[in-house]
Protein backbone atom coordinates (compact mmCIF):
# COMPACT_ATOMS: atom_id res chain seq x y z
CA UNK A 1 0.00 0.00 0.00
CA UNK A 2 1.18 3.63 0.25
CA UNK A 3 0.94 6.69 -1.93
CA UNK A 4 0.94 6.10 -5.69
CA UNK A 5 4.00 7.32 -7.52
CA UNK A 6 2.12 8.69 -10.50
CA UNK A 7 -0.39 11.48 -10.88
CA UNK A 8 -3.96 10.39 -10.30
CA UNK A 9 -6.42 11.42 -12.98
CA UNK A 10 -10.16 10.93 -13.31
CA UNK A 11 -9.88 9.55 -16.84
CA UNK A 12 -7.67 6.51 -16.56
CA UNK A 13 -6.43 4.91 -19.75
CA UNK A 14 -6.17 1.16 -20.39
CA UNK A 15 -3.04 -0.48 -18.99
CA UNK A 16 -2.78 -3.79 -20.86
CA UNK A 17 0.73 -4.30 -19.49
CA UNK A 18 -0.73 -4.45 -15.99
CA UNK A 19 -4.35 -5.59 -16.36
CA UNK A 20 -4.34 -7.61 -19.57
CA UNK A 21 -7.59 -7.37 -21.51
CA UNK A 22 -9.39 -5.55 -18.69
CA UNK A 23 -9.75 -1.88 -17.88
CA UNK A 24 -7.86 -0.53 -14.91
CA UNK A 25 -9.93 -1.01 -11.75
CA UNK A 26 -11.56 1.94 -10.05
CA UNK A 27 -9.01 3.79 -7.95
CA UNK A 28 -9.92 5.30 -4.59
CA UNK A 29 -7.23 7.80 -3.61
CA UNK A 30 -6.34 10.17 -0.80
CA UNK A 31 -5.27 13.52 -2.21
CA UNK A 32 -4.55 17.02 -1.03
CA UNK A 33 -5.80 20.19 -2.68
CA UNK A 34 -2.28 20.66 -4.04
CA UNK A 35 -2.50 17.31 -5.80
CA UNK A 36 -6.09 17.79 -6.95
CA UNK A 37 -7.32 21.39 -7.27
CA UNK A 38 -10.93 20.11 -7.44
CA UNK A 39 -10.64 19.48 -3.68
CA UNK A 40 -10.53 23.23 -2.95
CA UNK A 41 -12.50 24.89 -0.17
CA UNK A 42 -15.04 22.64 1.54
CA UNK A 43 -14.89 19.96 -1.17
CA UNK A 44 -14.15 16.63 0.51
CA UNK A 45 -14.43 14.31 -2.49
CA UNK A 46 -14.41 14.18 -6.25
CA UNK A 47 -15.14 11.36 -8.65
CA UNK A 48 -14.94 10.85 -12.35
CA UNK A 49 -15.16 8.02 -14.80
CA UNK A 50 -14.08 7.16 -18.29
CA UNK A 51 -16.92 6.40 -20.69
CA UNK A 52 -16.12 4.83 -24.05
CA UNK A 53 -18.01 3.35 -26.98
CA UNK A 54 -17.43 1.07 -29.90
CA UNK A 55 -18.03 3.18 -32.99
CA UNK A 56 -21.53 4.65 -32.82
CA UNK A 57 -22.53 2.29 -30.00
CA UNK A 58 -23.62 3.36 -26.53
CA UNK A 59 -21.13 5.00 -24.21
CA UNK A 60 -20.43 2.91 -21.12
CA UNK A 61 -18.40 3.67 -18.01
CA UNK A 62 -15.36 1.39 -17.82
CA UNK A 63 -13.13 2.80 -15.05
CA UNK A 64 -12.59 5.88 -12.94
CA UNK A 65 -11.38 7.39 -9.71
CA UNK A 66 -12.74 8.60 -6.40
CA UNK A 67 -10.51 11.15 -4.68
CA UNK A 68 -11.02 11.92 -1.00
CA UNK A 69 -9.46 14.97 0.66
CA UNK A 70 -6.57 13.61 2.74
CA UNK A 71 -6.65 16.58 5.10
CA UNK A 72 -10.40 16.84 5.70
CA UNK A 73 -11.89 13.37 5.31
CA UNK A 74 -10.19 11.68 8.32
CA UNK A 75 -11.60 14.33 10.67
CA UNK A 76 -15.09 13.89 9.23
CA UNK A 77 -14.79 10.11 9.62
CA UNK A 78 -13.70 10.50 13.25
CA UNK A 79 -16.47 13.00 14.09
CA UNK A 80 -19.31 11.35 12.16
CA UNK A 81 -18.78 7.94 10.54
CA UNK A 82 -22.27 8.10 8.91
CA UNK A 83 -21.39 11.44 7.27
CA UNK A 84 -18.10 10.00 6.00
CA UNK A 85 -19.94 6.99 4.62
CA UNK A 86 -22.39 9.34 2.90
CA UNK A 87 -19.52 11.22 1.26
CA UNK A 88 -18.14 7.97 -0.15
CA UNK A 89 -21.58 6.87 -1.39
CA UNK A 90 -22.08 10.31 -2.98
CA UNK A 91 -18.78 10.05 -4.86
CA UNK A 92 -19.45 6.45 -5.93
CA UNK A 93 -22.76 7.60 -7.42
CA UNK A 94 -20.85 10.21 -9.44
CA UNK A 95 -18.45 7.49 -10.53
CA UNK A 96 -21.26 5.52 -12.15
CA UNK A 97 -22.83 8.58 -13.77
CA UNK A 98 -25.20 10.41 -11.40
CA UNK A 99 -25.03 14.19 -11.26
CA UNK A 100 -25.95 16.63 -8.50
CA UNK A 101 -29.60 17.40 -7.76
CA UNK A 102 -31.27 20.43 -6.17
CA UNK A 103 -33.30 18.40 -3.65
CA UNK A 104 -31.65 18.65 -0.21
CA UNK A 105 -33.25 15.37 0.89
CA UNK A 106 -31.12 13.46 -1.62
CA UNK A 107 -27.54 12.32 -1.06
CA UNK A 108 -26.60 13.73 -4.49
CA UNK A 109 -27.27 17.28 -3.34
CA UNK A 110 -23.98 19.16 -3.94
CA UNK A 111 -23.54 20.07 -0.27
CA UNK A 112 -23.64 17.76 2.71
CA UNK A 113 -26.98 18.04 4.51
CA UNK A 114 -27.12 17.02 8.17
CA UNK A 115 -28.89 13.69 8.54
CA UNK A 116 -28.68 12.72 4.85
CA UNK A 117 -26.11 9.92 4.93
CA UNK A 118 -27.54 7.30 2.58
CA UNK A 119 -29.16 7.14 -0.83
CA UNK A 120 -32.70 8.54 -0.82
CA UNK A 121 -35.57 7.68 -3.16
CA UNK A 122 -34.44 10.00 -5.97
CA UNK A 123 -30.84 8.78 -5.75
CA UNK A 124 -32.02 5.17 -5.93
CA UNK A 125 -34.26 5.96 -8.90
CA UNK A 126 -31.30 7.48 -10.73
CA UNK A 127 -29.06 4.52 -9.92
CA UNK A 128 -31.77 2.13 -11.08
CA UNK A 129 -32.09 3.95 -14.40
CA UNK A 130 -28.33 3.85 -14.90
CA UNK A 131 -28.37 0.13 -14.13
CA UNK A 132 -30.83 -0.44 -16.97
CA UNK A 133 -28.34 0.90 -19.51
CA UNK A 134 -26.73 -1.30 -22.13
CA UNK A 135 -23.89 -3.66 -21.36
CA UNK A 136 -21.09 -3.89 -23.92
CA UNK A 137 -19.02 -6.98 -23.06
CA UNK A 138 -16.66 -6.33 -26.00
CA UNK A 139 -15.24 -3.41 -24.05
Whereabouts are the PLM-identified features?
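Active-site recognition of the HExxH zinc-binding catalytic motif
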Residues: 86-98
Amino acid sequence: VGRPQRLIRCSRSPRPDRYGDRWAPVLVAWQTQGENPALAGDTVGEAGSLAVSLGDGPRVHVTGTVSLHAGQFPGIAADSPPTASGVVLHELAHLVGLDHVDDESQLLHPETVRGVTDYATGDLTGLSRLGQGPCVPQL
